[in-house]
Amino acid sequence: ATDATPEEVRALFKNSRIIGRRFRLVHIRFGRDIIEVATFRAHDEDSPKTELDRHGRILRDNTFGEIEEDAMRRDFTVNALYYDIHDYSVLDYVGGLKDIEARQLRLIGDAATRYQEDPVRMLRAVRFAAKLDFSIEASAASAIYEYGHLLAVIPPARMFDEMIKLFHSGKAVRVFELLREYQLLKHLVPALDEWLQEDPNESMLDFIDQALVNTDDRVNTGQSVSPGFIFAILLWPVVQQQATRMQPDRQKMIGALAQVGETVMKRQVRHVSIPRRFSQMARDIWTSQPRFHRTQGKQPLRLLAYPVFRAAYDFMCIQ
């Protein structure tokens, strides 16, 4: 972060570009890396450079200010620390160091206002709490129940990005627990939340837990996890239940899984905009499951040649 405006930063670095409309930033290329540079911001609702919607959500915030003002615009105290490269000191204007010692996630300012400004802060609270093994301070935690519904105004494309951050954090098991605890799952995967409210069978809950354990293991060892696999996990209880009701005959299950999978996914993308390559992968994983029971003739060889065979096989093994 700097007191230089985006235009001033852009003028200093030829290998840079200004990005963003809501929050203008500068991306500076440094070899293969991109360094993101933000200008200190100030709070000024009356400025023409600050725009709010009817819910109080910040649509645009490009009112620049001083470092002390910028600290107050950050979401959490632990995320408002500044490293001074001149004397190697840490500048703390909001008590962030004390909260780190207490392993506590505290919002800066009034919780209701901060969540209304950007409802995604509730998801960030869950992600940071899970990733850092911190508790969420009482007022910040209680406000999540009241303002969780504001996630409905967030564009589905942004919700997809946040979902991936949550479940690719290496702490997906804890993330899932916190999303359920704070009643946020219904805004991300409503079909799964409804299934959980009914009377979910323990074996399927064990499946979700083990699948997320495996996901965390892969992330923490530097291996990739496709978003398609994540959504296949989270929606499988719903898809399997509805497909079984539609077609009890396991020999005819593939068609039922395909039909139900399409319906469930169509509903899901209204909340979280899943790119087609990932939604199709999830559906292919589901329809592959009955094929593992077909061992006659050339059917196993056909399954081996399936594009999602490896992911589908891992999925089957977890079950």
What label would you give each PLM region?
Residues A1-Q319:
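Catalytic cores of the polymerase beta-like nucleotidyltransferase superfamily
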